[in-house]
């Protein structure tokens, strides 16, 4: 698999490409599958439809890897927090974590309840071309914790940060509990058939450096270290969004570092490129315009050259991006990097 070879810095015929949120609303086929499911959460839980959606971008765009269609919040959902997705607003937990008692009441072994995810993986792997990789994923302990404490997405993360500074032992207990669940969750994804795993730390930028390293990065390192010990042949990709200023403190046992669009690739390559393969980092809105897209691709490829790079966006696909430009991006990267 070209994608897996690239994760391990092996020679590849061209630079592989996939896109975060490549299965999404910009595809009419996705909209149809979502309609059949009835709701976003039901789409995640319906393995047949989730498989359909996982495969769509591979078939339509020609990307080099599929990423499992699911949501990072299925883990806290199965730990006992009721979850709903409110149209135009996003996820909302009906209960939140407020004290040590609420952390202790969270179910242990929630990963055992996620058979619909593992079924999607095994179905997808059976239908996916042998040349294409399947990526599994989860959210980081910190990012999941913020949703569980705030109850929804937040601009200030005030409740989470208040807990971090005034009652750190409660937050640590939650992060520890989540980390143990996520290690087993990703292990079962690997056993079900994924070829690589990725951890999304979407709200990494909410924390100052010292707090980030202690309350997020340390837990990411713990998870990736255990996974590399169990499955050395499976690449681990970490994507801490918005921490370009902290790159000099990044270390750990993982293979690929995801670079967001706000972090210059030149800096990421200089600081991390010798140790980790870099993934990223085209600004997604460049896909609105072909000229802007071409300029962005040119800049990235000039910096990264032929090895140690997986092409991706620096954030997820937007719902109204033209699909023909997404397809063009894949063709362009393949053509420009063919060796």
Curated annotation (Swiss-Prot):
Protein location: Cytoplasm
This enzyme's EC code(s): 4.1.1.37
Keywords: Cytoplasm, Decarboxylase, Lyase, Porphyrin biosynthesis
PROSITE patterns with a match to the protein in the record: UROD_1, UROD_2
Pathway(s) where this gene product acts: Porphyrin-containing compound metabolism; protoporphyrin-IX biosynthesis; coproporphyrinogen-III from 5-aminolevulinate: step 4/4
Enzyme class: lyase
Family matches, as Gene3D superfamilies: 3.20.20.210
MF term (GO), any: uroporphyrinogen decarboxylase activity
Any one of the GO CC terms: cytosol
Pfam families on file: URO-D
Single Gene Ontology BP annotation: protoporphyrinogen IX biosynthetic process from glutamate
Residues annotated for substrate binding in this entry: 21-25, 71, 147, 202, 315
Signal peptide (residue range): none
SUPFAM superfamilies linked to this entry: UROD/MetE-like
Stated family: Belongs to the uroporphyrinogen decarboxylase family.
Assembly description: Homodimer.
Main function: Catalyzes the decarboxylation of four acetate groups of uroporphyrinogen-III to yield coproporphyrinogen-III.
NCBIfam families: hemE
PANTHER family hit by this protein: METHYLTETRAHYDROFOLATE:HOMOCYSTEINE METHYLTRANSFERASE RELATED, UROPORPHYRINOGEN DECARBOXYLASE
Protein's recorded name: Uroporphyrinogen decarboxylase
Higher taxonomy: Bacteria, Pseudomonadati, Campylobacterota, Epsilonproteobacteria, Campylobacterales
């Amino acid at each position: 698999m070209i994608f897996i070879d690239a994760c391990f810095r092996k020679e590849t015929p061209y630079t592989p490409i996939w896109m975060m949120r490549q299965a999404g609303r910009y595809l009419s086929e996705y909209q149809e599958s979502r309609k059949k499911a009835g709701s976003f959460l039901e789409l995640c839980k319906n393995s047949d439809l989730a498989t359909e959606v996982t495969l769509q971008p591979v078939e339509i765009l020609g990307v080099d890897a599929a990423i499992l269609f699911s949501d990072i919040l299925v883990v806290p959902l199965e730990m006992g927090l009721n979850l709903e997705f409110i149209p135009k607003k996003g996820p909302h937990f009906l209960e939140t974590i407020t004290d040590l008692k609420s952390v202790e009441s969270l179910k242990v072994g929630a990963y055992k309840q996620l058979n619909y995810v593992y079924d999607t993986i095994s179905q997808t792997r059976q239908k996916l071309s042998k040349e294409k990789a399947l990526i599994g994923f989860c959210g980081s302990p910190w990012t999941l914790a913020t949703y569980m404490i705030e109850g929804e997405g937040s601009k200030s993360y005030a409740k989470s940060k208040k807990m971090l500074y005034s009652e750190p032992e409660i937050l640590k207990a939650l992060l520890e509990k989540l980390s143990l669940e996520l290690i087993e969750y990703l292990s079962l994804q690997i056993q079900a058939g994924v070829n690589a795993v990725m951890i999304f730390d979407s709200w990494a930028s909410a924390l100052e450096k010292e707090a980030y390293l202690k309350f997020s990065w340390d837990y990411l390192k713990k998870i990736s270290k255990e996974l590399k010990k169990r499955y050395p042949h499976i690449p681990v990709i970490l994507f801490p969004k918005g921490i370009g200023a902290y790159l000099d403190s990044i270390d750990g046992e993982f293979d690929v570092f995801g670079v967001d669009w706000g972090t210059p690739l030149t800096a990421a390559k200089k600081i991390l490129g010798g140790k980790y393969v870099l993934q990223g980092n085209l600004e997604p809105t460049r896909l609105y315009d072909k000229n802007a897209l071409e300029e962005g691709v040119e800049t990235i490829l000039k910096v990264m050259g032929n090895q140690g790079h997986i092409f991706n966006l620096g954030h997820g696909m937007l719902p109204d991006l033209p699909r023909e430009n997404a397809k063009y991006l894949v063709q362009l990267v393949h053509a420009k990097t063919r060796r």
